[in-house]
């Protein structure tokens, strides 16, 4: 209290302190980074290893298993997953949020290097990268030309664009979609090879021997030293065609005699188009936790600088930019701050009806809000959706203390007290209430420090900003506000016309409230059933309201994944994807861009819609129309997906349910029954499983006895098939200073049926040519094209899209029921992706909610020196929560992280009203009034400040509850919860709290008399 008195007597000191807060806040605002959400990305390290020609089973046993075995011992791993497929293994190591990304990367590199001695000698060295292999790119630069081939465009994208973009800070990787990388293709003709007695292994050996450049030493003279360079490398198709393979009867056999070499694309089974025009796309993938907007700005800057380096006929555009939504969403929240500020000022003026009195909160609000940016700066936060929502909420909060303080001083001035004395006396009287409400609000957010996982990271920044704003506002209310009040407020001999016109309304409101309160206190027993009804409503509605991690937002982007049956050719999935692309063009002809990308076995179509303000339909409506339309396209399967608010994995549906088993045979047995129940469940719109057992394969069974007697080894047979059919790399060549692969393979036309393999020959140890058909037997079979591990167990992930109106919480409940019905005790289940984040956040939030209630009760008990008074105040909490749930239920709002933030906020907000009433009633008891009269007078005297502070909070959040534009659903969820809770609790608090107070509050009058 001495601080209030001292600062009222020292106005310059109070002003200087306020200016310092403003100055530091402005500095913080101008230096803060901008992003969509706080950094909630778990550190993820990916390990990839290629082994050309090996099937999934070989990859799993020889590469994935040794790598996983070594990586598994690293501390701090949250999940370890892998996929083994034809020619490649990908391991994703997800760490806990507390683990440093660089430390995690170094640990993984160390373990991978130790595991390399267990890997096959001819596999590529494993690569370690600081990102999820399935991470969603944030931006794509589309490279197109009317006159250049995709090979040339790919080279430009690689040498010019990629080289520049991958040096941007916090970029994990830059990939080229639709890339046609140069390679030297050696096409083999098995018939001609048989005629000349040449095998694929001979070709490989010739490349190894004839395409080599080794250090050749030097010639040292007396005055000159010459370095020798043996020009053994080949660079053109002509040189490769002229390679001598052998000599037969005095005639040399060149490669051109048994095949031909050509400069062509390494990947011939992929293409990419944007709006029907072939292209290559350079996509930027950020590191976990990176600032996406800073990366995008750097990309724009680099591309502008690169314009002069690109040929005139090469044009670039941006296929998609996910940061557009982030920027627009942040701008929407910023404009909401201004709207909330204006609405709060209007409500203050309508209640106080004096521009001098209104001016004081007008000055205090910016001080608290700008000061919050300094809190964000010293805490290392960023300007993001949640910190800006915290600022919006703070608009209604920070004004409360200033209003209560100003009104208390103004009442004394109106009674004839001099402004200076009124400032001191008013501040002294209200000091305890201001401190109590501030501590209560800050205590709400203390449990969030203990929250773990994604929700903990998200809540932490939000809570720190609100708590910081409230602390600054209480400091300003106790120092700057009394000083301003003594300078600005004067006793008016006659009120203005607006005051005179509106005063009858407020007097009438006081009379109506006084009469209704007296009537309610005569039947105060009603307070108990009303409270019980509210508690029952909470129990019923909490179960009824669907739950999810975050509401779906209109991000102006839709993705369609296409998949054909296992074993389908590249041409088949290409034609199906183009068919879906044409369908999309007919449904949304005004789309900004439609990008189609196809590779062997799958395709993807990314639709970028016009900005929200430029169209009269939503992303969700378009997604539903496309979903309905593609049901008639039954040649293959297509899945429509929309990006979730949290989580950066591409191609994943919201429900990710992992089945873990001790053997793949058990999974194969149970999956059909499990999937059948998922397909039949109305909660799910679509479903799929990553583990398939339908990929056709031809097994080559070797007759070892026969091979041994004929002088052939298993290695001879395996290498012949490997170099003839798998497209195995035979070496490297250099062109324009860059290294490219030499790929050998039999012509497609001569390996399109199993019978073609019979025409392949191998050479025995006696030099004789043996037809492969004599040594092997071909058996058709099926096998999984990809094998999955999750936390070291063989696994299958069932992915499901949700039906319209269903949430992830309902989906997981149904999955748990299906698992209980179909799986035995040898199976384990786990969650992945968004599902895992949702389940973890739900338990964490409930813990924070309960801890907040306990903390507030204990803090209030300490402040009031009573265990009864805090109980009275805490009764406002169920009233508020019931109000929030009623509004959420009627408004169709889900229980998500934003609405839950609002509900936790309500605990502190509504407790403030209870504190004001109980504190004033206690003061009146101590001044001699009996308990019933004290609570009547306190409630009546606090009516206007409570209504004013509640109205300012509600109006400050009205722009959230009725939000439009980017990110609107998140703001609506939070705004609806807080507005609904405040409206219901404010009305009921004015009756329930006095009634319960009259029952159980300590009789302080008696205590005073005793003393």
Residue ranges of predicted features:
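Solvent-exposed, membrane-proximal periplasmic/extracellular interface segments of envelope transport
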Residues: 58-130, 191-212, 231-233, 571-653, ...
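Short, small-residue-biased leader/transition segments that mark boundaries at the very start
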Residues: 1-5
């Amino acid at each position: 209290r001495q601080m209030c008195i001292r600062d009222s007597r020292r106005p310059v000191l109070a002003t200087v302190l306020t200016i310092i807060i403003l100055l530091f806040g402005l500095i913080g605002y101008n230096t803060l980074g901008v992003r969509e959400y706080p950094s909630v990305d778990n550190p993820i390290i990916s390990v990839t290893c290629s082994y050309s020609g090996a099937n999934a089973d070989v990859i799993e046993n020889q590469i994935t298993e040794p790598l996983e075995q070594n990586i598994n011992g690293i501390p701090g791993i949250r999940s370890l997953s892998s996929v083994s497929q034809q020619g490649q293994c990908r391991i994703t190591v997800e760490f806990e949020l507390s683990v440093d990304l660089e430390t995690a990367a170094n640990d993984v590199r160390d373990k991978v290097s130790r595991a390399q001695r267990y890997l096959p000698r001819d596999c590529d060295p494993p690569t370690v990268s600081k990102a999820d292999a399935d991470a969603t790119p944030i931006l794509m630069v589309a490279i197109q030309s009317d006159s250049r081939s995709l090979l040339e465009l790919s080279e430009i994208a690689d040498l010019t664009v990629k080289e520049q973009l991958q040096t941007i800070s916090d970029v994990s990787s830059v990939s080229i979609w639709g890339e046609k990388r140069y390679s030297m293709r050696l096409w083999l003709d098995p018939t001609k090879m048989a005629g000349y007695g040449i095998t694929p292994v001979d070709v490989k050996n010739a490349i190894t021997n004839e395409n080599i450049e080794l250090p050749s030493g030097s010639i040292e003279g007396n005055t000159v030293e010459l370095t020798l360079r043996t020009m053994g490398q080949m660079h053109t198709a002509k040189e490769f065609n002229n390679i001598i393979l052998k000599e037969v009867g005095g005639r040399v056999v060149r490669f051109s005699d048994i095949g031909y070499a050509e400069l062509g694309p390494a990947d011939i089974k992929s293409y990419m188009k944007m709006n029907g025009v072939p292209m290559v796309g350079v996509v930027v993938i950020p590191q976990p936790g990176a600032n996406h907007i800073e990366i995008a700005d750097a990309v724009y800057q680099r591309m502008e600088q690169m314009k002069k380096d690109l040929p005139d006929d090469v044009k670039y555009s941006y296929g998609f930019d996910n940061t557009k939504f982030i920027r627009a969403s942040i701008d929407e929240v910023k404009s909401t701050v201004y709207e909330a500020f204006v609405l709060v000022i209007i409500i203050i003026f309508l209640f106080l009806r004096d521009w001098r009195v209104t001016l004081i909160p007008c000055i205090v609000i910016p001080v608290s809000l700008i000061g919050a940016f300094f809190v964000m700066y010293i805490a290392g936060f960023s300007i993001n959706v949640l910190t800006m929502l915290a600022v919006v909420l703070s608009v209604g909060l920070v004004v409360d203390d200033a209003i209560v303080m100003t009104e208390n001083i103004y009442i004394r001035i109106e009674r004839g007290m001099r402004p200076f004395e009124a400032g001191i006396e008013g501040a002294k009287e209200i000091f305890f209430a201001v401190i109590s409400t501030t501590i209560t609000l800050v205590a709400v957010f203390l449990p969030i420090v203990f929250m773990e996982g994604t929700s903990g990271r998200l809540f932490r920044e939000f809570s720190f900003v609100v708590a910081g704003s409230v602390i600054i506002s209480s400091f300003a209310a106790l120092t700057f506000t009394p000083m301003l009040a003594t300078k600005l407020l004067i006793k008016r001999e006659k009120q203005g016309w607006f005051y005179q016109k509106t005063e009858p309304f407020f007097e009438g409101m006081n009379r109506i409230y006084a009469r209704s309160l007296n009537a309610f206190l005569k039947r105060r027993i009603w307070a108990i059933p009303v409270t019980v009804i509210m508690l029952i409503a909470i129990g019923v509605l909490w179960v009824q309201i669907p739950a999810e991690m975050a509401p779906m937002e209109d991000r102006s982007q839709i993705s369609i994944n296409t998949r054909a049956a296992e074993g389908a050719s590249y041409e088949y999935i290409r034609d199906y994807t183009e068919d879906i692309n044409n369908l999309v063009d007919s449904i949304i002809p005004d789309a900004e861009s439609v990008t189609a990308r196809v590779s062997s076995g799958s395709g993807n179509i990314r639709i970028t819609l016009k900005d929200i303000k430029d169209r009269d339909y939503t992303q969700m409506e378009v997604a539903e129309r496309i979903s309905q339309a593609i049901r008639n396209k039954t040649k293959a399967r297509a899945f429509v997906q929309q990006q979730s608010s949290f989580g950066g994995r591409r191609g994943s549906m919201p429900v990710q349910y992992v089945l873990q088993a001790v053997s793949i045979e058990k999974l194969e047995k149970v999956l059909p029954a499990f999937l059948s129940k998922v397909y039949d469940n109305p909660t799910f719109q679509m479903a799929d499983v990553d583990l398939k057992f339908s990929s056709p394969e031809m097994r080559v069974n070797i007759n070892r006895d026969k091979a041994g007697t004929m002088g052939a080894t298993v290695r001879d047979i395996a290498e012949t098939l490997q170099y003839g059919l798998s497209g195995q790399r035979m070496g490297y060549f250099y062109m324009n200073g860059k290294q490219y692969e030499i790929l050998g393979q039999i012509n497609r036309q001569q390996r399109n049926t199993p019978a073609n393999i019979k025409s392949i020959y191998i050479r025995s140890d006696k030099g004789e040519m043996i037809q492969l058909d004599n040594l092997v037997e071909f058996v058709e079979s099926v096998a999984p094209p990809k094998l999955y591990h999750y936390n070291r167990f063989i696994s299958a992930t069932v992915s499901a899209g949700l039906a319209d109106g269903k949430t992830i919480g309902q989906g997981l409940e149904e999955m748990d029921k299906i698992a209980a019905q179909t799986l035995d005790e040898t199976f384990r289940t786990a969650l992945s992706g968004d599902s895992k984040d949702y389940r973890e956040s739900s338990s964490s939030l409930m813990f924070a909610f309960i801890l907040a209630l306990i903390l507030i009760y204990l803090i209030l008990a300490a402040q009031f020196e009573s265990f009864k008074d805090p109980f009275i105040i805490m009764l406002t909490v169920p009233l508020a929560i019931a109000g929030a749930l009623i509004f959420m239920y009627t408004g169709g709002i889900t229980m998500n992280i934003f609405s839950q933030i609002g509900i936790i906020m309500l605990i502190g907000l509504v407790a403030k009203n209870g504190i004001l009433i109980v504190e004033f009633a206690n003061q009146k008891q101590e001044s001699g009034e009996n308990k019933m009269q004290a609570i009547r007078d306190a409630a009546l005297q606090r009516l206007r400040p409570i209504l004013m502070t509640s109205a300012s909070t509600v109006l400050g959040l009205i722009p959230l509850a009725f939000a439009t534009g980017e990110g609107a659903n998140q703001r609506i969820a939070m705004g609806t919860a807080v507005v609904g809770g405040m409206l219901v609790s404010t009305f009921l608090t004015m009756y329930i709290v006095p009634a319960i107070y009259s029952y159980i509050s300590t009789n302080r009058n008696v205590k005073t008399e005793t003393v």
